[in-house]
A protein has these predicted regions:
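Short beta-strand->alpha-helix junction loop in the catalytic core
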Residues: 1-13, 71, 96
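A short helix/loop element that forms part of the nucleotide-sugar donor recognition site in Leloir-type
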Residues: 9-26, 32
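A conserved mid-protein helix/loop that constitutes part of the nucleotide-sugar donor-binding site
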Residues: 31-54, 64, 71-77, 119, ...
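Aromatic "clamp/platform" in nucleotide-sugar-dependent glycosyltransferases that forms part
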Residues: 94, 113
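Short acidic/histidine- and often glycine-rich active-site loop of Leloir-type glycosyltransferases
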Residues: 123, 136-151
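Short hydrophobic beta-strand element within catalytic cores of glycosyltransferases
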Residues: 130-134
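Conserved acidic donor-binding segment of nucleotide-sugar-dependent glycosyltransferases
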Residues: 146, 150-157, 166-172
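A charged, aromatic-enriched C-terminal amphipathic alpha-helix characteristic of glycosyltransferases
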Residues: 175-203
């Protein structure tokens, strides 16, 4: 399981990431969904990309930021051009501070085909970032549950679009409720929890 250092996350949240002015403007002034991970089959970004035109029909003010590199990146960019949505897609190859993006994102979107169990999901939860995830094996369903975020059927376009619609139309109170539930569930991923657990095992 991933182990988080909460103090490091708090420090990073308050530091600006090194990004160009255009992306910085999106992060600070626009509504955007964030996705983090390599452009590979596992992360399933090509599937997610094919859903974005439908998502923009629900909310045409959205932008989409992806952090990562990988073998599918060039194909991803070509398809975004064909779909005529390249003005809404921004890719950051690498950053030392994902927490800055998570703090400002409307939601983290995790369209993966599988996870183990999803470190990005755990980090997002601790940054009070809403999570929209596939119900893929090894993590998301167990961590998010029914009240910690928004789950859609893995690799189902209709389910993803519908779930994002539910999120975009959800009340602020309901979104906060889910964020709080997720953060509570993530306590077992903190370094403090692991240190306390180890101490108890030694003493007992």
């Amino acid at each position: 399981d991933p182990i988080l250092n909460i103090n490091e996350i708090q420090k990073a949240r308050n530091k600006e990431a090194v990004i160009n002015d255009h992306i910085k403007k999106i992060v600070l002034e626009k509504k955007f969904f964030l996705s983090i991970g390599r452009f590979t089959k596992q992360k399933n970004y090509l599937f997610y990309l094919s859903c974005i035109p439908e998502i923009l029909k629900i909310d045409n003010e959205l932008y989409f930021i992806f952090i990562g590199k990988g073998e599918d990146k060039e194909k991803f960019l070509k398809i975004s051009d064909k779909l005529n949505i390249s003005d809404r897609i921004f890719i950051v190859d690498h950053t030392k501070n994902v927490h800055y993006f998570m703090k400002n994102a409307n939601a983290l979107v995790l369209p993966s085909l599988w996870e183990d169990p999803g470190f990005v999901l755990v980090e997002a939860g601790y940054n009070s970032c809403a999570v929209i995830s596939s119900d893929c094996p090894n993590g998301p369903s167990e961590i998010i549950g029914e009240d910690g975020g928004y789950l859609f059927r893995s690799n189902s376009k209709s389910s993803l679009v519908q779930t994002i619609g539910l999120f975009l139309n959800d009340s602020k109170k309901s979104i906060i409720f889910k964020k709080v539930n997720l953060k509570k569930r993530l306590k077992r991923f903190t370094s403090f929890y692991h240190a306390t657990n180890l101490k108890n095992k030694i003493l007992n």
